Design a protein with these regions (language model features):
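Reductase modules of NAD(P)H-dependent flavoproteins
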Residues: 9-13, 157-257
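A short, basic/flexible loop-to-alpha-helix module at the beginning of a structural domain
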Residues: 110-121
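Phosphate-handling active-site elements
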Residues: 146-157, 247
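Short, conserved phosphate/pyrophosphate- and ester-handling motifs at nucleotide-, phospho-/glycolipid
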Residues: 49, 134, 229
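A phosphate-binding catalytic loop at a beta-strand-loop-alpha-helix junction
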Residues: 125-141
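Phosphate- and divalent-cation-binding pockets in alpha/beta enzyme and binding domains
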Residues: 116, 137-140, 171, 235-236
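Ferredoxin-reductase
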Residues: 4-104, 124, 164-166, 190-194
């Protein structure tokens, strides 16, 4: 007799999440830790890479809705987290970084999204490319599977290429340093506006020469995910197609403001 897998926990409709902790990631980025406003803890189950849709009623004359990928991972019990980077002219991102404080409540709907590792459809080597705040889903994914590599339902190997402007913009850097020490995890960081090659960084945008170097030998057994600026993602997809990677093994996520 088999035991049925319990259905994921999920609240119907809009829920209220309370800010329980705020971390300064960089000069323009903050991570907000959220728990259920009534019962504490994380009130839902989710898959690394999914997002929440949030409604803000006090920013303007009309309610404003935005979606943000969770930067926390399901294996981190008791909370969920959003990592918010200021966007020039971005109404919500700037308001959150300037005004959201401990004890405030945020309305949320979800979790939602399919930008996740799917063991039934993806190859065993997961290769990811992110830039700036586009690293957040990948921090969640790498953290979730780092201690499960090779097990059922997890990739066997993970490679993450992430681009930042400078060392002042290193979002989730302590996590990435720790995760890069895990066997089977490879994290490569490039800085586009600062040359720190003497410290182990690459230098420049993740364009064709860099992609050839970092992704060499991955094309036959890998699935690819990318999140960041549209131009970067388009070039990444075109490059993978030139290497005869099937389109079903290329997955994209686009961030708005």
């Amino acid at each position: 007799m088999t035991t049925a897998t319990p259905a994921p926990r999920r609240k119907k409709g809009w829920m209220s999440l309370k800010v329980t902790k705020i971390e300064e990631e960089t000069w323009d980025t903050k991570t907000f830790y959220l728990e259920d406003s009534v019962d504490s803890g994380c009130p839902f189950d989710y898959i690394a890479g999914q997002y929440l849709t949030h409604r803000f009623d006090k920013i303007g004359e009309k309610p404003v809705v935005r979606s943000y990928t969770m930067s926390s991972s399901p294996n981190q019990a008791g909370f969920t987290a959003l990592t918010i980077k200021r966007v020039e002219g971005g109404l919500v991102s700037n308001w959150m970084c300037d005004n959201l404080k401990l004890g405030d409540e945020v309305r949320a709907l979800g979790p939602i999204g399919k930008f996740c590792f799917d063991p039934h459809k993806m190859r065993p080597h997961l290769v990811m490319l992110g830039a700036g705040s586009g690293v957040t889903p990948f921090v969640s994914i790498v953290r979730e599977y780092a201690d499960k590599l090779g097990r059922e339902g997890a990739p066997k190997q993970m490679t993450l290429l992430v681009a930042y402007r400078s060392k002042l913009d290193l979002i989730s850097w302590p996590d990435l340093l720790a995760l890069n020490k895990v066997p089977g995890v490879r994290i490569v960081t490039t800085l586009t506006r600062e040359d720190a090659r003497s410290e182990g960084f690459l230098h420049g945008r993740p364009e064709i020469p860099m992609l050839k170097e970092v992704l060499a030998g991955t094309y036959a057994d890998s699935s690819y995910m990318t999140c960041g600026p549209e131009a970067m993602m388009e070039q990444f997809v075109d490059f993978l197609k030139s290497q005869e990677v099937p389109v079903e093994h290329i997955h994209l996520e686009s961030f708005g403001n």
